[in-house]
Amino acid sequence: MENITIKINGMEVSAPKGSTILEAARLAHIEIPTLCFLKEINEIGACRICVVEVKGARSLVVSCVYPINEGMEVWTNTPKVLESRRKTLQLLLSNHDRKCLSCVRSGNCELQQLCKELGVTDEGYYDGERTPSVIDDSAVHMIRDNSKCILCRRCSAICEKVQGIGVIGANMRGFATFIGSAFDMGLGETSCVSCGQCIAVCPTGALQEKSQVDEVLAAIADPKKHVIVQTAPAVRATLGEEFGYPIGTNVQGKMAAALRRIGFDKVFDTNFSADLTIMEEAHEFLDRVQNGGVLPLITSCSPGWIKYCEHYFPDMTENLSSCKSPQQMFGAIAKSYYAEKMNLDPKDIVSVSIMPCTAKKFEIQRPDEAANGIPDVDYSLTTRELARMIRKVGLKFTTLPDEEFDAPLGLGTGAAVIFGATGGVMEAALRTAVETLTGEELQNLDFTDVRGMEGIKEATYPVAGLEVKVAIASGLGNARKLLEKVKSGEATYHFIEIMGCPGGCINGGGQPQQPGYVRNSVDIRGLRAKVLYDSDKNNPIRKSHENPAIKELYATFLGEPGSEKAHHLLHTTYVKRKVNEI
């Protein structure tokens, strides 16, 4: 690719033709601040924070969208530039709820951080009329507080361009502009799928999950309740970011230790029920293939994807696996098998999950997720909520010793831990399905064709005389593209894995929020996913059907995969919804 040479702050910089000033500056290790910019998602130059001086230009230019040309001279830190950025921040503050002490994003707010770096304080803002403050808490999973919104449009961009939904966007014009749903509808009245990607990219506290930390702590304090917790595979790969660890650090041991010290009676691993999911899903897949069932079979682990399918592809709900998600399977087993084993009344068990996902808050309230007549899972907290809980009870996370999960629901395999990355469920299922079909042990357990962060992946595997065609999609916009190919007959598959969030659970809507400059320059998904693949590689048991705890569960309680008891506890149903219908 042809390079162009420009000068930035008097220093020559070579950058590919077509680059923006912002991109060229980063090649020179110069960080121009941004608020609205998300690479390839939201490149609109709306916030005006990234302005720079360009020789010959009549005014300051927006560096995130301004292309470079040969011989250009740029200055990023002149008094004029710095003053413009300060005034922009002051204008934003003049229409902003500045109650930082009570804001969930305090200390991790991009607006707050820029004000700190540029010396902007409460005393410098402009007083005057403010847009009306609107709080929308109609959705199960999140709250929208427009008094903290800076109109960066990151949320609407990711909802429309990446997820292909577009239930939030800019309303009205000029000073009256606000971000929200159309026709004054609450988010809970729309076909929002609760994926939380809007929260993940929000630079301020305008969007946040509905926290249940206090309710969980109250349950722990109740001596009549037996409170158990499960942690999803992806959480161990990301929780450390909340406590200063580099992206891509496995903190499984410290996480287990923290949960125990918070006061949970038992600390379990969702990897256990991920293995259980594979046993049921592999059985369902083989049954459909061998007995002429509906194909392709599509995975059901991602509740955001499930709700999306119900809204936008209701005619394909028959393709969905009837298996509950690992979270829900765990809850059902905890309030039946575990309760029986521990001689506990299921009504006295409070089941809590720690998930990378905000859609799990919706999933636990679905009517068919109560196998024992009571909810399978009582509370679902995000990774961020767990971090807040750890701080709230006064634990110093970084100095905690590494501890193990509790038996009997704390043992998981390498196949289970890769559920957290796109392609992981498919790979785990193939390990079990192939060995079941062939009756032979796999020599190579790594199905590398289904790995990687590409939005859509395809592979074909010859198994016992059958060419098994599989596909993987992550991000709902990619799911739509894949399913439209299936519906049109352009592509045929036996098995499809879909995850609602781009990259899978490691990039879930409940994961630690990284600032825009990190999201734009670091392979966050790849680093997080590597934690899971390394964990799989180092696990002595890498196939779900070889998990001894799962074997015991079937031998002593469930019988066999697909049994009547397994169907009652571990399988679910779906509904056909309309767009903008709850």
Predicted regions and their residues:
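Iron-sulfur-associated redox domains of electron-transfer enzymes in respiratory
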Residues: 4, 12-77, 81-83, 93, ...
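Structural motif corresponding to the C-terminal cap of alpha-helices
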Residues: 163, 202, 338-342
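A short alpha-helix capping/helix-coil boundary motif
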Residues: 1-4, 135-136, 176-178, 233-237
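Fe-S ferredoxin-like electron-transfer domains
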Residues: 48-194, 200, 207-222, 226
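Conserved phosphate-binding elements of NTP-dependent enzyme cores
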Residues: 8
